[in-house]
């Protein structure tokens, strides 16, 4: 069975505001199965933003695990992320999951990978998924050369990614924390 895959998730931080958004396309091989999927969520009583890319079932499994780690560690984003990455790296079942998470709270943005990496972007811009590089490049240019809000930067960057990446569409969901 082919995996569901392909998406673009982007987070932009400017000042005390962070925005995280994603497109809505879900593909199975070369077929678009859905165009309005919700791959971005607010969790932990609306204090943490999460976006996911990769296999749909795998991403939901990781999202569930991440939420339980947040609860266990009282919302401490770095600690919950590191603990999830440890489990992901060492648990036989979790090691097979093919997905990535992009998470953010008021202070920190992190990318969590299946290799056990927990990465904090230097410039407050994080991106994952097949269109992530396009969106990240656009966001960097917009952040450095405009006064747009993080939400507007995410929206414009996802649009650019959707015009370039066949696995990314123009249906966006964007969440913010301020």
UniProtKB/Swiss-Prot annotation:
This is ATP-dependent protease subunit HslV. NCBIfam families: ATP_dep_HslV, PRK05456.1. Keywords: Allosteric enzyme, Cytoplasm, Hydrolase, Metal-binding, Protease, Sodium, Threonine protease. The gene is hslV. Na(+) binds at residues 162, 165, 168. Protease subunit of a proteasome-like degradation complex believed to be a general protein degrading machinery. It is an enzyme of class 3 (hydrolase). One of its GO terms (cellular component) is HslUV protease complex. The active site is at 7. It comes from Janthinobacterium sp. (strain Marseille).
């Amino acid at each position: 069975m082919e995996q569901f895959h392909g998406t673009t998730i982007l987070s932009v931080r400017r000042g005390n505001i962070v925005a995280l958004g994603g497109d809505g396309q879900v593909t199975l091989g070369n077929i678009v199965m859905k165009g309005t999927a919700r791959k971005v969520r607010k969790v932990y009583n609306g204090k943490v933003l999460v976006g996911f890319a990769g296999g749909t079932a795998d991403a939901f499994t990781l999202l569930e695990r991440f939420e339980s780690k947040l609860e266990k560690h009282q919302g401490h984003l770095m600690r919950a992320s590191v603990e999830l990455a440890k489990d992901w790296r060492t648990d036989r079942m979790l090691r097979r999951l093919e997905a990535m998470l992009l998470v953010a709270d008021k202070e920190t943005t992190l990318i969590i990978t299946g290799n056990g990496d927990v990465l904090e972007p230097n410039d407050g811009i994080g991106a994952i998924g097949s269109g992530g590089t396009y969106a990240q490049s656009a966001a960097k240019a917009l952040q450095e050369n405009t006064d747009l809000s993080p939400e507007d930067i995410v929206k414009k960057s996802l649009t650019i990614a959707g015009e370039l990446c066949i696995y990314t569409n123009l249906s966006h969901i964007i969440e913010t924390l301020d």
